[in-house]
């Protein structure tokens, strides 16, 4: 189903050809939603840039375009505003027809893209032997939302988890565990993940303070890298232990990922160095192999190179990222690769992408994008920490959100003198708690830092998950009272728009298509959150001003259909955010 914007754009392009000739057929008519609804629903701004090109008055150009526009079935007569804006007001009859088509479409009018490319979304990426913390929250849920949106639009999406499963930390950990807990290197599940994290901290302390231990750890890394059977088995056990803990978090967040850690690319690292050398872009700097790039300098203004091989011959993150990028293009055949990491890595990825272009790993036909995000801060405005100053564990954060949601629900049940089963309370608390954490994050512009507040994210008013979930549950309650079988209405449906608030709701329901396409393009989930919040508010205004259950037919059924269409839109939008709806709260 073609969006309103696409329909209007096509009509304007036809009018431009009629008005000024075939050479104008691909000119963008600049059709957008009107900012001031007093002037109409949509606005075309093409007359202004065209007037400059043709050397005529913009209002004169606008009138010529209007004379050749064929919009009788879609809009009232177009008007010219200001210096030459073309204002368009949609007809109620057109809106009613569009809403009927939307209602009868299982995908709410959103078509899948044709000949969809393969897309890789690289997100989450925790480190082995460490617990997932609040820093992993944003990457995990932003990446999941982007992947869900692209999958819904028909793209083949490979969701990759680039876990940190290689490096000197394993030499430290294996060496330390051999001394204090050797069973952990030969038997599964003898350690809790928290114990493993503590052992890692102690190993790091020893590494920093004890030269002999440092040497032993380095030897352990060499043994691991050379494929020593005992070392590999110990490494595998440590990885498996962490994986199981990660999976518990992913299951709770309903996030699907395919693990392909740093170690996967080890066989390809030497080939990366060879390729860079063959291209003649490697330079030695203090014993390290580097690539110097334009536009990258340190604080002193000196050139800042990307180091791809350390002076001791070892590789680093840049080497692994280049190998991964090369593999994803050449082996996975990806045409679009999206990296979801914190904004602190923006410079790193800009360098990696530029080196990949210089080395001919990255052709112009492949789009690579770094999707940066800001910090999660506490209510004191500082980076979110525990009272003891440690990074907040993601598991603890989710548990606390669910506990808050449970208390809120129990207080509400008591106030309403309502009894519910323990299963109901557990399900609602878990759903609301996890949804609140997700929505609070996704509703912010990802580029910004945001303040983490349980009270704000669990509020039943405002741009929050509980508000959205309550709006959906309320509509389901209305539908149950309306006693209507939506599935068996067939072709005999009619949506009537009479009152201002139902016209506004109808118009807004038709903007979902454009919103999802905007998220596809901008990779900003907050655009979808803003749409859903505004939709909920418009529905509430409609319900307050337009009787539904007490109306006579055919208005009653029409308004129930608008209720159901709103519920379906909320459900779809929330599902793209990774949030499940509740039939009752």
UniProtKB/Swiss-Prot annotation:
The enzyme's E.C. designation: 6.1.1.19
Annotated motif 'HIGH' region, positions: 126-136
Localization, UniProt: Cytoplasm
Keyword Secreted: no
CDD domains the record matches: Anticodon_Ia_Arg, ArgRS_core
Listed SMART domains: Arg_tRNA_synt_N, DALR_1
Membrane-spanning residues: none
Subunit-level organization: Monomer.
Protein name as annotated: Arginine--tRNA ligase
Naturally occurring in which organism (per UniProt): Crocosphaera subtropica (strain ATCC 51142 / BH68)
């Amino acid at each position: 189903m073609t969006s309103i914007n696409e329909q209007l754009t096509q009509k304007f392009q036809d009018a431009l050809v009629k008005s000024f000739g075939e050479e104008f057929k691909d000119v963008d008519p600049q059709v957008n939603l009107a900012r001031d609804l007093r002037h109409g629903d949509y606005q075309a701004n093409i007359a202004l840039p065209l007037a400059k090109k043709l050397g005529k008055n913009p209002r004169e150009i606008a009138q010529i375009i209007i004379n050749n526009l064929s919009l009788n079935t879609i809009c009232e007569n177009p008007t010219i505003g200001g210096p030459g804006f073309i204002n368009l007001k949609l007809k109620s009859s057109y809106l009613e027809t569009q809403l009927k088509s939307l209602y009868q479409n299982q995908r709410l009018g959103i078509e899948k893209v044709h000949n969809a490319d393969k897309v890789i979304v690289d997100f989450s990426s925790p480190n082995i032997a460490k617990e997932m913390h609040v820093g992993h929250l944003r990457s995990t849920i932003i990446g999941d939302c982007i992947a869900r949106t692209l999958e819904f639009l028909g793209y083949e999406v490979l969701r990759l988890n680039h876990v940190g499963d290689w490096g000197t930390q394993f030499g430290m950990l294996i060496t330390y565990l051999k001394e204090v807990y050797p069973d952990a290197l030969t038997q599964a599940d003898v350690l809790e993940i928290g114990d493993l994290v503590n052992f890692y901290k102690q190993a790091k302390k020893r590494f920093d303070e004890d030269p002999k231990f440092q040497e032993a750890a380095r030897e352990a890394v060499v043994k691991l890298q050379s494929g020593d059977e005992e070392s590999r088995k110990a490494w595998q056990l440590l990885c498996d232990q962490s994986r199981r803990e990660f999976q518990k978090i992913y299951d709770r967040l309903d996030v699907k990922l395919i693990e392909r850690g740093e170690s996967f690319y080890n066989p390809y690292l030497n080939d990366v160095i060879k390729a860079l050398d063959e291209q003649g872009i490697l330079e030695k700097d203090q014993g390290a192999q580097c690539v110097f790039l334009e536009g990258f300098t340190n604080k002193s203004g000196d050139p800042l190179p990307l180091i791809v091989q350390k002076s001791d011959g070892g590789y680093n993150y840049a080497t692994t990222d280049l190998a991964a990028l090369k593999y994803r293009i050449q082996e996975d055949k990806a045409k679009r690769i999206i990296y979801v990491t914190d904004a602190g890595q923006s410079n790193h990825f800009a360098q990696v992408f530029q080196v990949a272009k210089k080395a001919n790993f990255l052709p112009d036909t492949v789009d690579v994008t770094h999707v940066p995000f800001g910090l999660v801060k506490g209510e004191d405005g500082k980076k979110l920490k525990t009272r003891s100053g440690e990074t907040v564990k993601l598991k603890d954060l989710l548990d606390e959100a669910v506990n808050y949601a449970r208390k809120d629900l129990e207080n509400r049940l008591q106030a309403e003198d309502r009894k519910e089963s323990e299963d109901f309370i557990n399900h609602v608390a878990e759903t609301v708690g996890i949804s609140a954490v997700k929505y609070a994050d996704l509703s912010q512009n990802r580029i910004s830092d945001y303040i983490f507040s349980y009270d704000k994210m669990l509020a039943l008013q405002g741009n929050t998950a509980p508000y959205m979930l309550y709006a959906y549950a309320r509509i389901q309650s209305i539908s149950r009272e309306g006693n209507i079988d939506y599935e068996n209405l067939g072709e005999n449906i009619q949506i009537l728009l009479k009152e201002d608030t139902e016209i506004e709701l109808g118009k807004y329901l038709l903007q979902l298509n454009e919103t999802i396409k905007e998220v596809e393009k901008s990779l900003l989930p907050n655009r979808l959150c803003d749409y859903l919040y505004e939709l909920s508010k418009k529905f509430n205004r409609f319900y307050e001003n337009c009787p539904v259950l007490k109306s006579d037919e055919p208005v009653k059924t029409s308004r129930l259909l608008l209720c159901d269409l709103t519920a379906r839109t909320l459900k779809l939008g929330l599902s793209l955010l990774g949030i499940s709806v509740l039939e009752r709260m």
